[in-house]
Amino acid sequence: MAQTNGDMEHSKGWSGHFADFSTAQFRRPRSVCSSDETNGSFFLLQRLPKPNQSNSPPMVNRLKDSRKRRAAVVCRIRDTRDGWFSALVLSSLTSSVIGLFQISVKLPHEPYKIQVMVSSQEQVQDVRQSIVELPGTFQYTCFHLEFNGKRINDFVELSEVEGLKADSEIVLVEDPYTEKEARMHMVRIRDLVGAAGDRSDNLHGLNAGLSLHDAVTAEAAADDVKEHSLSKYDITASPSLETILPRVEAPLPKTVKSISLSAWNPPPYHLRQKGHLLYLQVTTNEGEQFQITSHVSGFYVNKCSNHKFDPLPRTTPKKVSAHSLLTLISKLSPSFNSAFEALQESNNKKDLLTTFPFQNAIPNSPWLVTPPSSNPNSHQADITRSQESYLVSGVDNAETLRDWNEEFQTTRELPRETVQDRVFRERLTSKLFADYNEAAARGAVLVARGEVAPLNPTEDRDAQIFVYNNIFYSFGADGVGTFVSEGGDEAARVAVGKDVLGIKAVNQLDINGLFTPGTVVVDYLGKRIVGQSIVPGIFKQREPGEHQIDYGGVEGKDVVATHPDFVSVFEKMSKALRIKKHPVWDKEGKRHELEGSVETKGLLGTDGRKYVLDLYRVTPLDVTWQEEPGSEDYPHRMSVLRLELVEAYWRSKMSQYVKAEVERRRAAKAQEEAANKEQSSEVTESKEQESEEKAEEALDQERVDISGFQLALNPDVCSGQVPQTEEEKKQWAEDEKEVRDACEFLRSKVIPELIQDLHDGDVGFPMDGQSLSQLLHKRGINIRYLGKLAQLSKEKGSRLEALTTLLVQEMIARAFKHIANRYLRNVPAPFVASCVAHLLNCLLGADVNPNPSAEIDASLREIYPEGDFSFEKVTPETLRAEVEKQVTVRYRYTLEAEWFASLRHLQVLRDIAIKLGLQLGARDYAFTKAQLPAKVPVANGVNGASHDEGKKKKKKGGDSKSPSRAVVEEKPVISIVPDDIVNVVPLVKDASPRSSLAEEALEAGRISLMQNQKQLGQELILESLSLHEQIYGILHPEVAKLYHQLSMLYYQTDEKEAAVELARKAVIVTERTLGVDSADTILAYLNLSLFEHASGNTKAALVYIKHAMDLWKIIYGSNHPDSITTMNNAAVMLQHLKQYSDSRKWFEASLAVCESLFGKQSINTATILFQLAQALALDQDSKGAVGKMRDAYNIFLNQLGPNDRNTKEAETWLEQLTQNAVSIAKHAKDIQARRLRRINMNPRVTTLGTKVQPQVGQTAPEASGAKGAANASMDSRSIDELLKFIEGGDATSSRSKQKKRAAASNPKLRGSKKSSA
């Protein structure tokens, strides 16, 4: 996206996207409001004109004068299909500034007139869309609007409609239908009345986009009187898989039995001439079947039956017709209206975000789903499922065929001068990439399944190419020998993955005049498939002597092409990516100057555009890795540095340059001042001179000119280039040294720093393979360094035992993925489940069955004589050996002898399922003999599949009817059967760029907050939120991140209600886009719990903590380092509820984890001992309180010394507790009685005692919004207050004092550089 800052004036937008089947055109940013409070209202964000302040950044300038006039409002936004929801969005408060006014819309049917709030800058089609979405006007889809008797063009702005002003009346006029409009109308009505049923496709898996938020919230709201949710919670209990499964819900009210196309379609020619479009069949709840004609004038009941064709209007007994199918059905079915209202009410109970349709992102498909056997009736007959392709796309599917490449490039060529231009351009770009990614992934699945005919069927399978839906597909394998010297198929597979990352980086740069093809990489069933938009001219046969490529290496490195038109655009790209301009030599030794790597190619398309291709080498090779012992065994030579590492190296070098420049200036200034001092006799002004020096030095530092700093890396060093002259060799050696320095920077600085940060507890700890990979990539560390990280982690001892476990687990899971992909690549589709199940049994189920055998249908196998069934020969021993070999070769790490005995089976299974795209049926999997049920009849090899005795009985009863029952019972026990592999979903890697405009606003907001301009910073972040929602849509991972950040901002500014609302949205969007059990989802739930507690809703907060802890058990297990903070928060919340006994249990659990990780003499442990001592005092255990406080005091004394604030405070507490211990014991009974009467716990203890949970890789100060983490005191309560409370006294104090002491919270629990293991 464009990096330039533009004016922010007159930009407009709407807070979210709404699906519109009937509008094929992409709409410009909308800004529409409805004033009808009963029907909800739409609020817009209207950007205000920029004040003329030249010294401030443009984004800051724009909001300087407007910030007092902006407010966050809670408004109701609705979607036509899913009801209403409350969302925090922005509203400009002055309609005079934003051009808002109200108009009336006259309707042909009830309610005959509605009021709509509009903006003069929005388009007429946006008004259309708001009409379509209002409950009273659901039925209208085919209409136009008129004003003063004249038709208004849908694509003009309201300001262009002559005479239109406030309180004007426009008229809705129903249009005649076309066949397409009639089809769209039917699809929409089926959605509205809940008759659409489940749509199944090959891209979205089962329960795609699942959210559990509503179910968890329902548990929190179930009974306010009952005991808290943690009362019987067992921290050490085994994880329950039901935590991540959708809850059983009551079926939605049924409005009609079915709406489908009739068997009489399509209309004969002579009836088409009379306006017949479609024939429909509707069966009402009363059991009556009606044949309906879709006519250009509307819909009417005809005289057809299932056996007789007569599409003329029926006269008796029901002569009914209507322009809308919805109205017609309501006339035909007496029960329809009441059922439809009940359906809407049922939908309204859900948070709309949980059912809102995805638009700019692919929903997450959970790895664990409800097994089909648990609900045999889940798949219902619905003839329209097979008709939907026709309804949406027409007879020949031509309506959905798009010229993807032309769309991408024309979108890039859209104007970007004004902010309004940029908003529209980035919205369109985001939507286009989302549509393309989805279409390309669907096609790739068909290619992988062999359902698309190749263009070159005579070639080898890996060399075949395909075109489907105007997308060009090829395999990520070395079918034509391009990568023979680099590692063959392995190198090709890595190259296409790196290519997507390179294209994504170039897309983000948004260089004017440089174009990239739409690119997606899909991993499915062991195959890697590349889908690209078709570049004009890429298949063109060139004249003899002409190269197929215009810039860069042609067919390898032997022939090099150059073209003057590519120099300028490649120069811009290379400068931004830190690529050095350098020479390369062809096979004849001829020198060519290239701006990028010889592997990066430029193609001049027949459309005149300059395309860049093959961006897998935008960074240099990791030379040090390739020269290490064991490099000859590494699968390929495509091990390059990450872009994040190059950027970090550049920043490090620039920092050194700036420091050297400042030192040089200081030295020069010192010499100058020394000379001046000798000449001057005025000593009295030395102090003033000193202060001037400091000020000038600061200015010098600010004014360091970095234009003299140059750092760029040559991506072609150590890759076979042969310099010819001595000068070239010298320059090449210098380039190679710079690359080696970057590699050394990774090894000697970046990797050790990460290990140290995790050791010291300075950053959020990864929870699973996904969060670990994200953390490494963010730091610029390649996955191949997992082995080195594991070695360094091991050296740190028990403190990083959790990290070592995660690293080893990730290496094993990735090794298994490579092995499984190799077997899956050529396995026939019906045997994929057997293959995966057998490999998993060999890895995870060897304790249950040391000799598992693959379940294969012999008769089915016979029809695949060329299929690869080598997976049958795999045994637990051979698989372990292969895993060990893969880990050694790929990560240069040696697994321990009995590594498989210490595997955390559930966590490994989850990691593998996510990496292979598996969806497993949920049941209690048995991976050890101890987990096997005592004596359970085994059905189809399933062991322990049922959750309760009732289900077992049902299954037993059902199985008894099977003729093969006796044979099935004789099967040996295995952990996983083929039926457990319910589905496999494709894994998609895309090149979608992020919105630079939204990020600019966010960055400006962050800078303002860092400069203590809180109000301005908040305004800018709110601005960024609106831009995020406009550009990405509501359901997108980037939007979830921003909801999280914004909720944290509101929490810190004490706007608790807004913080809770945004945190709730963050939870739902994170669940639906990243997964119901992702690490980000856990953090979202933990922060929501914190905000709910701060709002006084502590019972609900504990429900969210319980859910997060349950998720933690599934994805990591127990005793995660970050769980210390969570358990402490839970304990403090329980104190707030006066559940002192339960509170001390959670402090004790937190202490146990802390001692195991940080040791018994660490500051972390002392901090928790301090809190535990207070909890024991509150629970009337004065003796225990004294003991724990003494332990805390001793640790602080040894670690921090006698003069430290923590040591002194612990000493004071210890003295007071000791003095009062005897009297407390004497009056125990009296204390208890008075405690029940007079306790009034200080709210400060709870609100200020809880801590924000940092995200993975995020520092604790970043999470809490603090600038630094100083040694804060351990508790904001005074000793007198606590002792008064223990003795039954009144411990209340003013809230103003509580807030003043907000900074005095507990020291960080997650680690300290001074603590010792």
Curated annotation (Swiss-Prot):
* Cytoplasm as UniProt keyword: yes
Compositional bias per record (Basic and acidic residues), positions renumbered to this chain: 669-689
Q: Which residues form the TPR repeats?
A: 1040-1073, 1082-1115, 1124-1157
Q: Where is this region: Disordered?
A: 669-700, 939-966, 1252-1273, 1288-1317
Which InterPro entries does its entry note?
Answer: CLU-central (IPR033646), CLU_dom (IPR025697), CLU_N (IPR028275), CLU_prot (IPR027523), GSKIP_dom_sf (IPR023231), TPR-like_helical_dom_sf (IPR011990), TPR_rpt (IPR019734)
Report the SS bond pairs.
Answer: none
Q: Which GO terms describe its cellular component?
A: cytoplasm
Q: Cite the entry's keywords alphabetically.
A: Cytoplasm, Repeat, TPR repeat
Q: What family does the entry list?
A: Belongs to the CLU family.
Subunit structure of this chain's protein = May associate with the eukaryotic translation initiation factor 3 (eIF-3) complex.
Protein name as catalogued: Clustered mitochondria protein homolog
The uppermost taxa in this organism's lineage are:
Eukaryota, Fungi, Dikarya, Ascomycota, Pezizomycotina
The gene that this protein is the product of is clu1
